[in-house]
Amino acid sequence: MYEEISSLANPRVRRVLQLQQKARTRKKENCFIIEGIRLFLDTPDDFLEEIFITADLLEREEARIREKITRHGCRIVTPEVMKKMSDTMTPQGVLCLASMPRYSMEDLLTGCPLLLLLENIQDPGNLGTMFRTAEAAGAAGILMNKGTADLFNPKTVRSTMSAVFRVPFLVTEDFSAALTQLRGRGLRIFAAHLAGQDNYDRADYTGPCGILIGNEGRGLTEEAAALATDLIRIPMHGRIESLNAAMAAGILMYEADRQRRQADR
């Protein structure tokens, strides 16, 4: 039999709310929230800690959900409790706690790495989109400074579409030192910058390299830009001065992927 939770004052409900609302709690407990059917099904079993599901979903949903719950167990919650715990307007009926993946710099530097290097990205949706795009474009990993948005913010997690479990990442306290370390390991660092003299499609991304993207409004800091080996730009027509950070990252990563696929032929 599964435990049933019907009280909004239940300690487990209060814990979920703390994890939803406070990055400090997530960091302290090394735990974050996964919400929705697809994200739940995509979460590797090794990371699942606790599952909450409504009775209605458990009764009507597909076999894969039942199989996962059979392996891990769950707690049945009322629709009112699920709505209280949920970060979305229309809860899908399943929410779980997952442990945070942990990586080292060496995990990012496998083979001939293509890395995405992020400085002070603030929008959770942008960060999540960058993770999805990095996975799709074959990036080896993502390095972020501590000023970048919380990866485990519920909105960011949803935006990654589970790429948070598949793309190695590292948050560094000293971004400049990390960039210097990457250069010392032989990586070229291409910075998307308005001062770039060369168009992005003239650069050679076939060797070990990183693509450096700065804050949505302010761009890269002078310190980070100075550590790039190459300043590149994306040419734009009309009166547009800049692109969305996630879009710029996608353009550059896919150009790198195109060149690498062509070089392998």
Task: Give residue ranges: language-model regions.
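Active-site/ligand-binding-proximal alpha/beta "capping" segment
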Residues: 190-240, 244
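Boundary-proximal intrinsically disordered activation/regulatory segments immediately upstream
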Residues: 1-62, 148-149
